[in-house]
Regions:
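Cytosolic regulatory regions built on CNB/CRP/Popeye-like sensor folds
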Residues: 1-327
Length: 327
């Protein structure tokens, strides 16, 4: 059972939020930055999808599963500028509650709610982190935990020892899951890493590590989440494009195989039905394997067949032409 169900913040969702019963026939995009959803019962499957004008296009790629007690954050897709978003699809009779992100932020920053809000946000970050890294993995050089400052040599792979660890940099930079630089020159980088995701240092790097409660207390977490979502979509954009290329190659290989198999089958049919002493040969436009196969079958049955006249229509059905030529 998810411990977040006993989180006092979730009571506010149920008292103040708008309730909805969702299922597989009511998917919705998490593209409203002014909304936060709480999963009261059931579960919600989260997919990454291409988005055009606030509508899903193309295939769905499963990201992670949100359980009862979890929250879902709306994301401003204009700030990510990648034409990618998250689609939420509930199991039948899943119950969710929605409140405004402003109200959630107000509740989360209340000193008495910091630890509870941190648990809710950690579950969201861990779900996204699992989704972006579930198909790739690498070794780990160093497990990190909260510390004022630490130095890591160039090229090291670091992960969180436990839970969500937020990293910030005094020197150097890192690659998120080996794909995207996390730092922006002249800007403060605050990046979460979990046991599923990793950071690879670029040059000698000095960084500090804190848990989620620290940026929640000072308010830095909200911009950190915006940057994290953008970082995820940059990586997922590449993942989706690679998946589309793989699917194209799979279909092309399948089509090539079917063509080869069909040609081999026709060749085998001709070779099996060839009669010793048959002298008639075919050339030019009539030397196709389908007509040759038809001729061999008819010859064995004592039926005469002649090649059909060449059609001006290049799309003429060759099966119809062959059968029409039986006399």
């Amino acid at each position: 059972m998810n411990n977040n169900i006993n989180n006092p913040l979730t009571d506010v969702f149920q008292k103040e939020g708008t309730s909805s019963i969702i299922g597989g026939n009511t998917p919705f995009l998490l593209d409203d930055p002014d909304a936060v959803w709480y999963v009261r019962s059931g579960q919600v499957e989260i997919f990454s999808v291409n988005v055009r004008e606030h509508h899903q296009t193309g295939a769905r790629y499963h990201f992670f599963t949100a359980q009862a007690g979890d929250i879902l954050l709306g994301i401003d897709l204009e700030k990510t500028s990648m034409e990618i978003g998250f689609l939420a699809v509930g199991l039948i009779d899943t119950e969710i509650y929605k409140i405004s992100s402003g109200r959630f932020r107000e509740l989360a920053e209340n000193p008495g709610n910091i630890s509870y809000a941190a648990k809710l946000l950690d579950k969201w970050i861990e779900g996204l982190s699992y989704g972006i890294s579930k198909d790739i993995n690498t070794h780990t050089d160093l497990l990190i935990e909260p510390v004022d400052e630490m130095e890591v040599e160039d090229g090291n792979i670091i992960r969180s020892k436990k839970g969500v660890a937020w990293t910030s940099y005094a020197e150097g930079n890192t690659l998120f899951i080996g794909m995207e630089e996390v730092g922006i020159e002249g800007a403060k980088a605050l990046v979460p890493v979990t046991q599923d995701t990793w950071l690879q240092t670029i040059g000698r790097t000095r960084l500090s590590v804190v848990n989620t409660e620290v940026p929640l207390t000072n308010g830095d977490i909200w911009q950190g989440l915006v940057d994290f979502h953008k970082l995820l979509f940059q990586c997922e954009f590449m993942n989706i494009r690679l998946a589309e290329v793989d699917e194209f190659n799979r279909l092309k290989t399948k089509a090539d195989y079917e063509t080869t198999a069909r040609e081999e089958a026709l060749s085998q049919l001709v070779s099996v039905l060839q009669c010793e002493g048959a002298q008639e040969t075919f050339s030019g436009d009539h030397a196709d394997k389908l007509f040759m196969s038809a001729w061999e079958v008819c010859h064995a049955m004592g039926i005469s067949i002649k090649a059909p006249p060449k059609s001006k229509n290049t799309n003429v059905n060759s099966v119809s032409s062959a059968t029409a030529a039986i006399v």
